[in-house]
Amino acid sequence: MIVLEDLVRDRGSRYAASGGVVSSRAEIDAFLAALRRRRKFDKATHHSWAALLADGPMKNDDGESGAGAVILKMLEREGTQNRIVVVTRWYGGVHLGGDRFAHIVTCTRAALAALRDAADGSP
């Protein structure tokens, strides 16, 4: 599991990204449970995620409308199979409107780069 904390801060909201290898819904559930076991992440407002599995794509907005679709589209564009990307948000009290999608893209890009580096053995 890779975890990239404090990637974006905007109007009180904070974003992080996580990623890892998964091949089934059960592994997705285990990944999300492991992430939530981290005290800081357990207190987050949203854990939006997407994964491309052999059985097909899966996503969940976790209350952040449209977020899962944005993450999934980026996974599909990259052709990333059997990986999950989770974008976590701690809501800061101010609605961000469409800016939140730019933050989701930024976090997803960072997670995908970290997953590529991990697969390549890069530091």
What does each model-found stretch correspond to?
Residues 70-71:
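Well-ordered alpha-helical segments embedded in enzymatic catalytic cores
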Residues 57, 81-82:
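Hydrophobic alpha-helical segments and their boundary regions
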Residues 1-65, 75, 113, 117-120:
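C-terminal regulatory domains involved in ligand/effector binding and gene-expression control
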Residues 51, 82-91:
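Glycine- and acidic-rich phosphate- and metal-coordinating loops
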Residues 66, 89-123:
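Active-site-proximal loop/helix of nucleotide/amide-processing enzymes and allied scaffolds
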Residues 74-81:
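Short glycine/proline-enriched loop/turn "hinge" motifs that connect secondary-structure elements
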